[in-house]
Amino acid sequence: VILADTSAWVEYDRATGSAVDLRLSELIATDGPVAVTEPVIMEVLAGARSDAREADLRRLLLRFHLYRFDAVTDFEGAARIHRRCRQAGVTPRGLVDCMIAAVARRHQATLLTRDADLTRVARVIGIDLDQPQQEPPQPT
């Protein structure tokens, strides 16, 4: 299953034509194995420019498999991921990326992202990346 992170949904929503946008569009069109998690839903909905757009985005996201964020397991997992990344010389800019990574790791999901920071985190902790992009991940 491919866990699409916030940056992938933003690419899709803006129809950027990037490789990540095209990959997520393909997965959606073919009923591919796409999942979301609450931290991603939170970030995507927070970026909505209106209540109507928020409702549209919520309907879209909730069509896909939900990897529930487990507060007991995933908060601790995110803290361990953050610490491990720092020890490897990669300091994540935000804990939400570590929360998303913790969920992906627990479910053994592949991440689809255009976020350079989350890409580095995934590489440090050994999460598989769905890498359709020809362009480099965008800095956060």
Annotate each predicted stretch with a short phrase:
Residues D31-G32, H65, Q108, G126:
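Residue-level detector of structured alpha->beta connecting loops
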Residues V1, A101, R105-T140:
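Acidic, PIN/NYN-like endoribonuclease modules and their adjacent C-terminal/linker elements
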Residues D5-T6, V44, A78, A104:
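Generic structural signal for small/hydrophobic residues in well-ordered secondary structure
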Residues L27-I28, C85, A104, A122:
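A generic structural signal for well-ordered alpha-helical segments
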Residues W9-V10, I41-V44, L118-T119:
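A generic structural signal for short hydrophobic patches within well-formed alpha-helices
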Residues L66-R114:
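Active-site neighborhoods of divalent-metal-dependent phosphate/nucleic-acid chemistry enzymes
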Residues T6, E38, G94-C98:
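Conserved glycosyltransferase catalytic-site signature
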Residues V1-V36, A46-R59, D130, Q138-P139:
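Short, well-structured N-terminal submotif of metal-dependent ribonuclease cores
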